[in-house]
Amino acid sequence: MAKPRVYELAKVLNVDSKTVLEKLKDMGEFVKSASSTIEPPVARRLKAEFAKDNAKGDSKPVQQRRPAAPSAPASTSSSAPTPAAPARQASPASAHQQAPTPGAPTPRPQGGARPGMPTPGRHGQNDNRENGRDNREGRENGRQSRPNDRRNNDRRNNQGRPNNGQPVQHQNNRGNASAPRPHAQGGAGANGGNAASNAIPRPHAQGPRPGNNPFSRKQGMHTPTPGDIPRPHPMARPTADNGRGGRPGRPGQGQGQGRGFRGGRPGQGGQGGPRPGQWGHNRPGQGGGSQGAGQGGARGGFRGGQGGGNNFQGGGAPSNGPARGGGRGGRGGAAGAFGRQGGKSSKARKNRLAKRHEYEELKAPTIGGVRIPNGNGQTIRLRQGASLADLAEKINVNQAALVTVLFHLGQMATATQSLDEETFQILGEEIGWNIQLVSAEEEDKELLQQFDINLDEEELQDDEDLKPRPPVVTVMGHVDHGKTRLLDTIRKTNVIAREAGGITQRIGAYQVTVNLEGEPRKITFLDTPGHEAFTAMRARGAELTDVAILVVAADDGVMPQTVEAINHAQAAKVPIVVAVNKIDVPGANPEKVRGQLTEFGLVPEEYGGDTMFVDISAKQNLHVDKLLEAVLLTADAELDLRANPDMDARGATVEARLDKGRGAVATVLVQQGTLHVGDAIVAGTSYGRVRAMLDENGQPMEAAGPSTPVQVLGLTSVPTAGDLFLVASDDRAARQIAEKRQATERAAQLAKRRKVVSLEDFKKKFAESEIDMLNIVIKGDSSGSVEALEDSLMKIEVSDEVGIQVIHRGVGAITQNDVNLATVDKAVIIGFNVRPNRQVADLAEREGVEIKYYSVIYRAIEDIEASLKGMLKPEYEEVVTSHSEIREIFRSSKFGNIAGVMVQDGEVKRGTKCRILRNGVATVNDLEISSLRRFKDDVQSVKEGYEAGINLGTFNDIELGDIIETFEMREVERK
C-alpha cells in the first residue's frame, strides 16, 4: 500500500496541511514538509486523533442552536402512520417549493450534497462520516420514546405494511447545513436509513482494500490523479420503481421496494448515505427500503441494519417507531470469494509480525525525531573502517536514521563514510548497543573462513604428518659488527662487497648445508640490517626465526642496536646464541662483552647461565664451525622443529621488489606445506600464480618445502615485507581475497584520516595548519628499504614550525605519475637505488621537480634534515655597530639640525638604524641616518676616530653630549 503524503491526509481530514504538521509534531513524529510521506500506522493514528478532537469539539448539546422537531407517538396500526412533524413530499418539485420554518426540519437537496457540505472524494467518503453531531439528551429521549420490544413490533408490523408504492413522508432532524455524507432520495422507496442526529461519533477503521471485493467496480489500489485531486463520486438520483427489493437479510419477512440508505454510525444521527457502486442493492449494514410511510432509524449498537426486500426485515426501525441511534454497518461476506467470509469492518487483522513491530516501535527511543530499537547492551562486532551502513545492516534499522542520530550528537557523517572506534562507541552508548571493532587479525581470519580456509585448524596437525625441518636462524647485531661478513664466511661468498656503503639494507635469505658429526644438516639464514633505520626489518626477522645469532664486536662491546636486537629476540621468545666477533682485532675484550650482556639477561654457560657464547673471527674464519654446532644444539634442545610438508603452503614475505624484466619478485619463507610452481597464492593485498621459483643462487626450483626461502615470480603487485602468504584453491579465490583485503585496508585508512575536531582542539588544529610541510615522494628498490626510509624520515624532529609528509611511496623506478604528483603537491622525489628513464627525467626538469638519488640511507636522512632546517623562518638579533658622541649642532633651514659627532667605536654607515642615548637612556628608537658627510663630502661610512656630520631626517631633538648608537639586524642560524 502506498504511503500517504501530508497534504493528501489534509484533504481527507478537511483541514490545512499546517494543522496536520502540528498534530504530527504533537504526536512525536518528525515530518519535514507537507509533501513528506508517512507510514500507514502513523496515518491511522493521526485520523484517530482528529476523530477524538472532533468528538470533544462536538460534545456540546445542539438543541440550543436549533429547535427540536416535535415527535408523534408511534402507531401500531398497519396503515401508514401520521408523521410526527410537518413532512415534505418525496417528489423533487416539492423539495424546491417548501421553505424551512422554525421548528420544522430543513429540506434536503435532491441527488447531491447538502449546502455547505465539502465535495466528497475517494479518500473522504468513510472519513467524512466522523463529522456527525453529538447530542446525548436527544439520544436519551429517543430511547424513552421507543417501544420496549422492537423486534416484536418489527415482526408484527411487517405483516401489515402497505405495498402500494406511495412515497413515504419522513422527517429530517438535521438542522445543520453541513453533513459528513451526501444523501439523495432512492426512487419511490422510502429512506429507511434515517437515524437520529444526536449521537456520539466513533472513530472507525478503514475497510479492506477494494481489491478483495468481487462486487465492487473499482479493484486494486487507488489510481493517482494529477495533483492527487479527489474526484467526486456520483450521487444517488431519483429512479423509478423497478420492483426490486434490497439485498435479503433475513428470510420470511416483508417485501420492500426501492433502495434504502446506509444506517448511521453508533451514536450518530441522520440518514445514512448511499454506497457508491451497486445501485439498487443493499449490503449488510445498509437500511433496507420498505413500502409505507414513516421514518426508519438504523439499529443501534455496533451492528448495522439488515437489508430489506420481499418478506425481509428492513434495516431501519419500524415505520411507526421512533428513530434510534444508527449502528456501524457491517461488511458483507463474499460468499466464498476472496478471504474470510463476512466479518466486521472495524480493523483489518494484524499478524504477529506487525504487532511485534509496533510494540518494538513503542519501546524504541526517539532521538532527533527518529526511532531506533534499543539494543539493551547487546554486543555487536564490526570491522575496522566500518560505516553507518554496515551498522544499520547489523541492527536492522534505516541508514538515514543513524545519520540523524549522529548529527544530533554533534558529528556529521554520511552513511557510507568510514568511522573510527571512538565515534562508534559514542553512537553505541546513545542507542544502547555495545559496538566493538574487531582487530585486523580476527577480521582476516573471518575473511579466510568465507573461502573455507581455517588457519587455526591447520595448525593442529597430527604427529604422524609432521616431519623434521631445518631451523631458521637470524643474524642480528649492531651495524659494522660483522654480520654480513659472518654469512659470507659461512656461504663462502662476498655479499658485503655488493652492499652500498658496506652496510646491509635489506633482508637476505639463504640456506646452507652444514656437516654436524658427519651428518649433513640444512640451516636457513636471515641477514637483517643493523642500521638504526631498519628497526622494522629486525623485528620482522625476529618473528620469523627459530634461533637468533647475536653478533657483538669484541672491541666495541654492547651498542644501541645490540640492545634493540636483544629486546626483539626476547619479545619473540627466541633462543639466542652470542657470537663475539673480531677477537683478532687489537683491543678486543671478549670478557667485557660477556659482562655487559649479563645485565640484559644473557648469562654465559661458564657463569652458570644457559646462553652459549662463541668467540669467532668472521674475517679469519676462526671458530665458525663451533658457532654452527652451537646453533644446531640449541635448536635440537629447546625447539620442536617439525612441519607438515603435504599441506598447502603457508609462509611469510621476507622481502619484495619490482624487477624491470620480471615484474614483482617476492622473497618468501615457506613455514608450512610445500609451494609448487603453478599454485595460486595471496600475499597481503597481492595475488597471482607462481610462474617460477628461484633459490638464493638464482637456480630454478619446482617445489619448496618448510623452512625454505625462495624467490617467487608471478604476483600482480609488490607485496609488503612481512605479509603472510597462502595458497588459494584457484585464481578467482585468490583475487577475491586480495580485493577484499584492499577494500578493508582502504576503509581503515579512511577511518584513521577522519578526525573529529572539537571546540577544544580547534585552536590546536588551526596552529597545525600554519606548519610548513615538506612533501616527499619515496621510490625504492624494495619494500623493506622504502619502509625503513619512511620510518627514519618521520622520526626527524627539527622544530614545531616545519614537518614532513610522505604523500606517496612505492617500489620500482620513478614514473611519470610520480612526477605529476610531485608537481601538484610541490614535493621532492627521493629515489633510493632507483632511477627514472630519460622521458621522465626531462619531464621533471620542465616542471621544476627536484629528484634526489641515494644509495645509503643515512645520507638521505642527513639531507632531508638539512632541508627542514632551511625551511625554518629566519631569526634575527640586534648587533650594535658604532657609538658616536654629539659635540656640535649645526642648524640648517633646508636640512634641519645636523649633529657634528666624533665616532668613538665601530663604523657609522649611511642608512643604518640608530637610537639616541641621553644620560644612558634611549630616548628615541628606530631612527635612521639619512645623510652622512665628512666635511663637505657625502660619504658612505666613517670609521672610529673620525669626525662626521649626521642628519637624522626630520628628527631635530638632539642635544650636546647625546650618543648616537647605530645597530643592524643580523640573521642567526637556526639549530
UniProtKB/Swiss-Prot annotation:
Compositionally biased residues, Basic and acidic residues: 47-59, 124-157
Keyword terms, alphabetized: Cytoplasm, GTP-binding, Initiation factor, Nucleotide-binding, Protein biosynthesis
Role summary: One of the essential components for the initiation of protein synthesis. Protects formylmethionyl-tRNA from spontaneous hydrolysis and promotes its binding to the 30S ribosomal subunits. Also involved in the hydrolysis of GTP during the formation of the 70S ribosomal complex.
Region (G4) residue spans: 581-584
Pfam families, alphabetized: EF-G_D2, GTP_EFTU, IF-2, IF2_N
GO CC term (a single one): cytosol
Start-end of Basic residues biased regions: 346-355
Listed Gly residues bias regions: 243-275, 285-342
Region: Disordered, residue numbers: 47-359
Annotated segments matching region G2: 502-506
Biased composition (Polar residues): 167-176
InterPro entries for the chain: EF-G-like_DII, IF2_II, IF2_N, P-loop_NTPase, Small_GTP-bd, T_Tr_GTP-bd_dom, TF_IF2_bacterial-like, TIF_IF2
Protein name per Swiss-Prot or TrEMBL: Translation initiation factor IF-2
Region (G3): 527-530
Low complexity: compositionally biased ranges: 64-101
